């Protein structure tokens, strides 16, 4: 897209993660081998409510001055290029709006340029 290597990420507006993504030009996308139980907790508990990173015994590290996890197998460091909110009038399948957005808390879509890729051997 736009002659760049990009990723697309989606975050609901109430997610604590959104505050971190919005506060910086860059963010990380971290991918893991295993850690199913830990990742399930990270996806269901808010960092506003408890220190979930500590609870799962993950460790923050920085790559290109961007926070990520030491436990990640693959990390993309990306720079935001574009952000917009999913628009209900753009759904072709309108059942998605009804089923997935009863609170009308539409995801924010971020398009970001891949700056670096790190693979842990």
Model-derived regions: residue spans:
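Active-site-proximal mixed secondary-structure blocks
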Residues: 1-121
């Amino acid at each position: 897209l736009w002659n760049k290597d990009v990723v697309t990420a989606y975050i609901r507006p109430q997610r604590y993660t959104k505050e971190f993504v919005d506060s910086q030009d860059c963010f990380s996308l971290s991918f893991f081998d295993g850690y199913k139980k830990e990742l399930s907790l990270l996806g269901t508990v808010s960092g506003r409510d408890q220190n979930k990173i500590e609870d799962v015994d993950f460790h923050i590290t920085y790559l290109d001055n961007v926070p990520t996890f030491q436990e990640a197998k693959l990390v993309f460091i990306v720079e935001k290029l574009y952000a917009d909110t999913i628009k209900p009038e753009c759904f072709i399948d309108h059942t998605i709006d009804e089923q997935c957005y009863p609170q009308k808390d539409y995801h924010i879509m971020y398009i970001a340029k891949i700056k670096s890729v790190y693979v842990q051997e």
